């Protein structure tokens, strides 16, 4: 699809193109479905997809009636799956207006196990639903049916009057009626008696906790974790994560499958495989289950008097369509469970200080479960999967936001490139020098047409073809300033086929009427690889059948003449270059580029940037001084040198009197030791968080009593990173502490505290174990504007706090899910936790606070509900506390994992050492003894590394070397042995050019450290050396005599290999110039520090196609005793 881009925002143009594509794709979906219905068994899937893909959005091969009939068929289908039954009720009388064929048998069948109580109920049109179920069930059902957000109560446990059998009733509203799906409760299944997400969450608690604990920055790791957790939670044979690309085609990006199943990882499939109508339904119903694709579907019988058709789109029992069923059967998938992953539109801006408008949503992808035999998943577990998918979607959204931030950085980089290009010989410099226009956006080729001459880079059409494209653009796109397309063939360029696969997509912009810049991309299929299993020799797929392999084949056929689409941010960069060049070429025949104006512009930008930085700095100082949270600071001696307005107000001690006093004289006696320890650690660089202590009050504030603070200590450092003081960011928790103290003393009179109108009582609300609001104190009523009577006995999640029709509206779905996680953690018995929380009060004001959730226990220790305290600190403090808590948790988990690994390695290592010692007592040959010696030295090296408890000592040069005699031969041989497996794996030949006399040299020093260093640099060299090449290690030994008996040995090790060598960024990490070093870079940094402890250093040299590490150390020559 070609796009001529006028001057408009990227978001609007992108959304417009997406809407156009959806409309066109829906027509294509309708035609594929029509072909299938008409052709029956002779339906040729691959050719159908291929033909429909050639139809653009403006040209429909069939009438609109086909599309209309298709959408009606999707939305108004009257068939259900037989694993349950369905009733439709009039929403006013609760009488049956439609029912499935199997409903009478399932709901009114007599069971001999239940005593007969008279006439059996008859189920039909007009039946009162209350006559079918037991009295308690009918009462519960009617109560739910009168509920506004009825879906929040699903599932509702009911029992049939005649058989006594239990069913889950799953209710949803449609226009004019209520649809109820009834699913039998299996005998092995413990029925869920409570409604809503609170109970279902417990089923997915482990999976949610694992997702929540993942570090950000890796979409692949997130997807792999999600499919693994769903695989374990649901028990399906195969679980996959599907991602929809910008052109609506899909890809399997993660997969877990039982042994013996062929993998589908890496598979791509056309957009028609999951029609747009189905995607729309996934946006409405986040979880979809097919129990048995071979089962016979049942009809829904509707009251003939109804003036409208019922829609079953929201039904859990809705039958899949025949085309999809055949696809499933062809891939040997009899049952499936699909979860929608819905994220925010990437181009939406959410602005406004209070409650932001709801973001537009899009279907990012699906989590799909397949089973080779029929499989039924109870509704509570499906509900848990839906909740898990929402948590997953939040994390996907965060990863996408992180990617967008990277894109924004790339845009800034392109702006720098633009300026760099224009500071030189523009416009020729943008193609003749480096960086050039191919560095601006990802492309396979680029060209400049300037003054009837052509400059080409990479894969491009030839000069004649480029002039032909320019002529075609002038003729057919003369009104536009350029064109971007992922298919010149689809855009209508007559010579597209002659260009072949190398040139499919193009972005072109005009500089002047006659001058243009082009970027070209090759076809998408060249970048697509299916990671699935390949065929055995002689096996073939029937391309006519709907199957993943034929989908993949069809997809490759579709994209043969199509490139990767041009991203909006890429086109923004291209248009930026176009606008700058056009402004400098107002008269191309008589003028050159005005460099001075560009330099002036750049200079103005720098001045603005400096002024903005100074303004930000001043604003930060002002914010600290006027912050609504207490902030204080001390110098190295513990004397106050910072005391902001808020701390002065709380304590009654003005700034001028506080400055110069020792911090310990200002705190209560009971807190002196706590503060002394915190201060001592902070001055050592160890910053403590969330430390609670009491500080004295002065003057008129003495009567109030001491102030309770929770403090985060931060070390102040100078330019050389030396600690010069400590500043403390505090939170006043005096009011909360008073309440908690009272609560502790008066547990038996809980209501007297909570309902006390005293302004010191913070806002408190609570819930029982079933999720109904059971507490709402006066402070909460005042804060929200909703009285106790208006919220008690409403569903806390959904009715009281929710996204749509609720008392206190939350910001978005992400906030709703996060609140559910926090509350459910308390219901699961976890310790109290605090979380950022925000909602819209009745008066329209957005309230931001900290939520503290505490579980309520009965006398037996069982959780019977929870209550929540709200704290209302500043927004800055909320964010700071949250970030600190997450960092602390991550650091603690990593520390525990490291401790676990170190501990678990010790046992097998001890076993290896013991086995080696046993072997040493046996009769061994010379070579065998040498191997044992090498093994022993490797084991000692492992033990040495495992015993490291403080890496900072190595970095700071404060460790002691363990000196002993050794030969250079044994150190080199042990070091080389540690990389031999990798060397053989890459087919590298290693050559040791160390002279024999040097090998036999006896030295005095820390052999294990030298061995560790050499092995590390050998490993990194092997990693970046080309396969099949050669790696050489040579040693130069130089002796210097110090006195009569001491010789100083200078060793130079040179590790050389062919190729460009290791990346520059890794070298920077080795020399300590990068703050966030990778694992490789940190290891090299430690090795270099160890070398410097041995009076040496490390250099890296690139020369004549070779790269070398040069490691120098100074050791003493060992004294050789002579016998006479």
Curated annotation (Swiss-Prot):
Domain called GAF: residue spans? 218-400
- Composition bias type Low complexity, residue spans: 1-14
Molecular function per GO? phosphorelay sensor kinase activity; photoreceptor activity; protein homodimerization activity
Q: How is it modified after translation?
A: Contains one covalently linked phytochromobilin chromophore.
Which residue ranges does the record annotate as region Disordered?
A: 1-24, 39-64
Keyword list (alphabetical) reads:
Chromophore, Photoreceptor protein, Receptor, Repeat, Sensory transduction, Transcription, Transcription regulation
An example Pfam family from this entry, by short name, is HATPase_c
This protein's source sits in the domain of life called: Eukaryota
Instruction: Report whether Transmembrane helix shows up as a keyword of the record.
Output: no
Cite the record's Polar residues compositional bias ranges. Answer: 39-60
What residues does the Histidine kinase domain cover? 900-1119
Q: Where is phytochromobilin bound in this sequence?
A: 323
Which InterPro entries did the record assign?
Answer: GAF, GAF-like_dom_sf, HATPase_C_sf, His_kinase_dom, HisK_dim/P_dom, PAS, PAS-like_dom_sf, PAS_2
Where does the record place the PAS domain? Answer: 616-686, 749-820
Biological process per Gene Ontology, one example term: red, far-red light phototransduction
Keyword Kinase assigned to the entry: answer is no
Q: What does this protein do?
A: Regulatory photoreceptor which exists in two forms that are reversibly interconvertible by light: the Pr form that absorbs maximally in the red region of the spectrum and the Pfr form that absorbs maximally in the far-red region. Photoconversion of Pr to Pfr induces an array of morphogenic responses, whereas reconversion of Pfr to Pr cancels the induction of those responses. Pfr controls the expression of a number of nuclear genes including those encoding the small subunit of ribulose-bisphosphate carboxylase, chlorophyll A/B binding protein, protochlorophyllide reductase, rRNA, etc.
Assembly, in brief, is: Homodimer.
Family classification: Belongs to the phytochrome family.
Recorded hits in NCBIfam families, A to Z, give: sensory_box
- Name of the protein in its database record: Phytochrome A
Tell me which species this is from: Cucurbita pepo
């Amino acid at each position: 699809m070609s796009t001529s881009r006028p001057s408009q925002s990227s978001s609007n143009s992108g959304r417009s193109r997406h809407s156009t594509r959806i409309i066109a794709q829906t027509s294509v979906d309708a035609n594929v479905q029509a072909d299938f219905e008409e052709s029956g068994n002779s339906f040729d899937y691959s050719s159908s997809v291929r033909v429909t893909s050639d139809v653009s959005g403006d040209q429909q091969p069939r009438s609109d009636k086909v599309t209309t009939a298709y959408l009606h068929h999707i939305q108004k289908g009257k068939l259900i799956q037989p694993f349950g039954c369905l009733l439709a009720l009039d929403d006013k009388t609760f009488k049956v207006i439609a029912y499935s064929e199997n409903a009478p048998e399932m709901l009114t069948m007599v069971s001999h196990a239940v005593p007969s109580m008279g006439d059996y109920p008859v189920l039909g049109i007009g039946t009162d639903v209350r006559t079918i179920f037991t009295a308690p069930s009918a009462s519960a059902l009617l109560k739910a049916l009168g509920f506004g957000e009825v879906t929040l109560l699903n599932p509702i446990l009911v029992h049939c009057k005649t058989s006594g059998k239990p069913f889950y009733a799953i209710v949803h509203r449609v226009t004019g009626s209520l649809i109820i799906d009834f699913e039998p409760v299996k005998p092995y299944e413990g029925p869920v008696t409570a409604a809503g997400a609170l109970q279902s969450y417990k089923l997915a608690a482990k999976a949610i906790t694992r997702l929540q604990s993942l570090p950000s920055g890796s979409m692949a790791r997130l997807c792999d974790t999600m499919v693994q957790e769903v695989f374990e939670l649901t028990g399906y044979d195969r679980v996959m994560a599907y991602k929809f690309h910008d052109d609506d085609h899909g890809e399997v990006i993660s997969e877990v499958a039982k042994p013996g199943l062929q993998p589908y990882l890496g598979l791509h499939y056309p957009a028609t495989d999951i029609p747009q109508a189905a995607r729309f339904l996934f946006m409405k119903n986040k979880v979809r289950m097919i129990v048995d694709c071979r089962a016979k579907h049942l009809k829904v019988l509707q009251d003939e008097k109804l003036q409208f058709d019922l829609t079953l789109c929201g039904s859990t029992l809705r039958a899949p369509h025949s085309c999809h069923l055949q696809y499933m059967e062809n891939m040997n998938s009899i049952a499936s469970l699909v979860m929608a992953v819905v994220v925010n539109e990437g181009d939406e801006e959410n602005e406004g200080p209070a409650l932001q408008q709801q973001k537009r949503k899009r279907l990012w992808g699906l989590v799909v479960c397949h089973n080779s035999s029929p499989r039924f998943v109870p509704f509570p577990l499906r509900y848990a999967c839906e909740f898990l998918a929402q948590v997953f979607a939040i994390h996907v959204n965060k990863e996408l936001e992180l990617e967008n931030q990277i894109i924004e950085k790339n845009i800034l980089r392109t702006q720098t490139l633009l300026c760099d290009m224009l500071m030189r010989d523009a416009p020729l410099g943008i193609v003749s020098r480096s960086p050039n226009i191919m560095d601006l956006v990802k492309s396979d080729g680029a060209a400049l047409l300037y003054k009837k001459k052509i400059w080409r880079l990479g894969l491009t059409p030839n000069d004649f073809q480029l002039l032909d494209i320019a002529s075609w653009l002038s003729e057919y796109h003369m009104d536009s300033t350029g064109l971007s397309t992922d298919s010149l063939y689809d855009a209508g360029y007559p010579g597209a086929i002659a260009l072949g696969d190398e040139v499919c997509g193009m972005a072109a912009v005009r500089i002047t009427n006659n001058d243009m810049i082009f970027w070209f991309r090759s076809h998408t299929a060249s970048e697509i690889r299916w990671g699935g299993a390949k065929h055995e020799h002689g096996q073939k797929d029937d391309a006519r059948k709907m199957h993943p392999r034929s989908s993949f084949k069809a997809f490759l056929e579709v994209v043969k003449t199509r490139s990767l689409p041009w991203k909006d941010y890429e086109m923004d960069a291209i248009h930026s270059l176009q606008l700058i060049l056009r402004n400098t070429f107002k008269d191309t025949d008589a003028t050159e580029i005005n460099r001075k104006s560009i330099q002036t512009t750049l200079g103005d930008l720098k001045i603005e940037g400096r002024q903005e930085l100074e303004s930000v700095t001043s604003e930060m100082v002002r914010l600290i001084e006027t912050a609504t949270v207490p902030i204080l600071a001390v110098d190295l001696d513990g004397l106050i040198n910072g005391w902001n307005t808020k701390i002065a107000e709380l304590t009654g001690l003005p700034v001028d009197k506080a400055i110069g006093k020792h911090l310990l004289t200002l705190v209560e006696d009971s807190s002196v030791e706590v503060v002394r320890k915190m201060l001592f650690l902070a001055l050592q660089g160890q910053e403590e968080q969330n430390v609670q202590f009491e500080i004295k009050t002065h003057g008129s504030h003495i009567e109030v009593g001491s102030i309770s603070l929770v403090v985060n200590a931060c070390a102040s450092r100078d330019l050389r990173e030396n600690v010069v003081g400590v500043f403390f960011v505090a939170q006043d928790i005096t009011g909360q502490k008073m309440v908690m103290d009272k609560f502790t003393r008066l547990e038996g009179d809980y209501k007297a505290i909570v309902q006390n109108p005293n302004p010191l009582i913070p806002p408190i609300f609570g819930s029982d174990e079933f999720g109904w609001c059971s507490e709402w104190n006066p402070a909460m009523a005042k804060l929200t504007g909703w009285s106790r009577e208006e919220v008690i006995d409403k569903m806390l999640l959904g009715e009281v706090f929710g996204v749509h029709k609720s008392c206190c509206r939350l910001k978005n779905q992400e906030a709703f899910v996060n609140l559910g996680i926090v509350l459910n953690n308390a219901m699961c018995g976890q310790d109290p936790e605090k979380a950022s929380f925000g909602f819209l009060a009745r008066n329209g004001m957005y309230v931001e606070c900290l939520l503290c959730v505490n579980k309520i226990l009965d006398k037996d220790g069982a959780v019977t509900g929870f209550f929540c305290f709200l704290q209302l600190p500043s927004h800055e403090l909320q964010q700071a506390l949250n970030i600190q808590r997450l960092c602390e948790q991550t650091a603690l988990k990593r520390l525990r994992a490291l401790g676990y690994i170190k501990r678990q390695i010790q046992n097998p290592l001890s076993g290896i050492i013991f086995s080696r010692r046993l072997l040493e007592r046996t009769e061994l040959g010379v070579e065998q003894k040498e191997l044992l010696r090498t093994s022993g030295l490797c084991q000692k090296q492992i033990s040495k590394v495992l015993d490291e408890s403080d890496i900072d000592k190595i970095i700071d040069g404060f460790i002691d070397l363990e000196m002993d005699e050794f030969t250079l031969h044994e150190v080199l041989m042990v070091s080389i042995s540690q990389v031999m497996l990798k060397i053989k794996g890459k087919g590298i030949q290693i050559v040791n050019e160390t002279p024999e006399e040097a090998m036999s040299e006896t030295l005095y020093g820390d052999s294990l450290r030298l061995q560790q260093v050499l092995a590390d640099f050998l490993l990194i060299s092997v990693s970046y050396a080309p396969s099949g090449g050669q790696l050489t290690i040579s040693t130069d030994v130089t002796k210097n005599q110090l006195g009569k008996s001491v010789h100083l040995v200078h060793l130079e090790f040179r590790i050389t290999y062919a190729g460009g060598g290791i990346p520059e960024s890794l070298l920077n990490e080795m020399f300590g110039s990068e703050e966030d070093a990778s694992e490789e870079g940190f290891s090299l940094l430690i090795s270099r520090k160890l070398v410097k402890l041995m009076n040496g250093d490390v250099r890296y040299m690139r020369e004549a196609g070779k790269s070398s590490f040069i490691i120098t150390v100074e050791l003493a020559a060992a004294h050789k005793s002579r016998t006479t």
